[in-house]
């Protein structure tokens, strides 16, 4: 072995536990969550990338006899690979990496049920959901309420807890999906796995978030169930690194007083999670392994060949410059302000009338603008959803309720002419002005937004009472590209606006 190869091998080995080569008295569960179609290393951090992830997974498998690989949802949506190819790339990647178990995230539903079935039926992993009743859907035959894997002479039972779709997933894109109480479902199936399937260990894969306030989350799941050894979570993009000085809490007592480990890797494949079950004392530990450039010399040529025909068009779109910025934008408030102002200005063109204000959601922004050139790829990746601009005619009373809904979530994006003082704990706005004037509950306002919010999703139920008076036929990112290439943003250098328009 050359010195260079030896050095590379040592770098990989540093990611492994010291006793890994000698130990066979443990089970290693590798896990990911919320990778969001980030196939290449993420442009903002340089971390992640499926080539590196596979190198790390292969290294663990080569050094550990008892390994399982699982994912906790939101494999898709967030890059050009999904926008252009609709899940085909992610399907091939998950199979190439050899995932054993996968669950649904909310973004798996983004393209609707028929495309979802096409994506799911091509996966090799076991597909499970414990608290979605899918009997009225077109994917019911693809899922089981749990799965059992035998490894290291032990039986490992997996169950899956999914997020409440109400107000989060467009109902038109999730037909036939019924939500069941997550705590009741988890307790029932955990009991079944322990007592009927005779599992030695039970792992819950979840896509409900680590700490969600008044909603079901991983902390609640840990504390109000029994029989579950670990929860491998997703949805909230939480990094739980027990070695960090400011680490999120990772160990909780369940109903029986037993310890439950809660794990999550953050987002975008920046880390690979590792949950280890010690077969000598039945203890469970967790950690995260950063997916960095140290792995670049260990890429799998077969995976590279799988990706090659998809990477070429993605790289081409990423090379088309459409605009410029004076400096990099942060997500909140700068990207949020820019999106809100764009939607308001462009909607005036669409509706051919004065627009009173705009409302957008931070969840609709998946990336940020860099300093310098903005490319077509930047726009499509930052605003990847199939949203359309709409203009609502809505009463001042219902508009005020919508702004209260925004306050309940800590503030979303509003146009530059809006100022609000929020009481987040009280879930209301104490004071709101539009163009310096308070909202008149009896007046009709014309509000620019996106169809997803106009449908009452993402907590914006009051907007359902408005009437759509104008709707763009284009996706939002196409309207943006048109504005950059031949509209009001042509040859305009963007400057970030850091004004906090809704204050606490």
Predicted regions: what is each one?
Residues 25-28, 38-41, 45-48, 52, ...:
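Feature captures C-terminal
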Residues 45-58, 91, 179-186:
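Short catalytic helix/loop segments, enriched in acidic residues and glycine
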Residues 23, 52-72, 100, 197:
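Active-site metal-binding motif and surrounding structural segment of the metallo-beta-lactamase
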Residues 284-374:
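Hard-cation-handling environments
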Residues 24-26, 31-41, 68, 76-180, ...:
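Active-site-adjacent helix-turn-beta-strand microarchitecture at beta-sheet edges
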Residues 2-21:
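Gram-negative bacterial Sec-dependent N-terminal signal peptides
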